Amino acid sequence: TTTRNLNALQEEGMIENAGEFESTGGRKATIYQCVSNYRCAVGIDITRNHLTIVLIDLALNIIDSKRMRIPFRETHEYFSILQEEFEAIVSANIADRSRLLGIGISLPAIIGEDHKTVTYATVIPLSLNIYSFFSNYIHEPYLFFNDANSAGLAESWKGDYTDSVVYLSLSSSVGGAYMNGRSIHAGDNNRGGEFGHITIVPHGKRCYCGRNGCLDAYCNANALTDFTEGNLKEFFEILKFGKNKGIINIFNEYMENLAIAVNSLRMCFDCDIILGGNVGAYMSDYLDDFRKKAVKLNPFEKDGSYIQ
């Protein structure tokens, strides 16, 4: 019966009593919720120049995390550091390894449906046997995920989005995801959401993909950090101070280019657009100005509140 199953789950420590619903005339119904720390998972994010490891519980609360600047190399030295940092976080927080559900590894690459193969990668060099190479250093179950899809799902789940939403990731590369609730539309070839390769300037700057004029060439984080020796935080600190006209002009140009892409996404999907990634984390102070730039390109609306 339902009651017996609920009691069994409580005894196992998987669920707990969270109060009662308001009465609708009869006996008040009990509210049960998942015990968030019953299980946990690790996320490993690998980019061109950074490694991030995050431990989360079932409610997506961050238990522990570590981010470090280290250029990616498919070498023993790099993976030994990854293994050491992974073990340090897990050992410090999990006494019983059976509580660890597994590991999601996000990569700036197009991932196969089996989540074990990389079908396209140019941002960082990945060999064909990269999945098995990981097994020399990580001994818990793990799967590969596209970086922007991972970030988009996290935003969707944490923000409890139920409608369609576009996530635009602005980091060392530009990517994204189109989500309907908590489901990603990956497309026929798992390339849905590769917004970084929308052409915004025909015959423009060279992109890492080999084409010219891609959004990525204009709006990845390097478009800003190239002027502060790779330090994004420093760029926005100088920008906030408001005295460096060069930095101000660079950011204005960045927002103009980004507005072209955001307007195109709005025309295509007609839903909210979340600006994420490393640059997106700094955009809150400039969101009103950016919305004004975007709606100037929009023939249908003058309210830019769909940009978040």
Where are these regions (language model features)?
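Generic structural signal for residues in well-ordered beta-strands
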Residues: 15, 134, 142-144, 305-308
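Hydrophobic "anchor" residues
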Residues: 62, 117-118, 184-185
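Charged, glycine-enriched surface loops/patches
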Residues: 295-307
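Glycine-rich phosphate-binding loop and adjoining helix at the ATP-binding site
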Residues: 66-91, 95-166, 285-296
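Glycine/GP-enriched mid-protein hinge/lid loop-to-helix segment characteristic of carbohydrate kinases
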Residues: 65-67, 133, 139-245
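N-terminal charged helix/coil linker that caps or initiates catalytic domains
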Residues: 1-42
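Gly/Thr-rich phosphate-binding beta-strand-loop-beta motif of the actin/hexokinase/Hsp70
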Residues: 28-64, 167-180
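Adenine-nucleotide phosphate-binding core of ATP-dependent small-molecule kinases
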Residues: 77-95, 215-218, 223-284
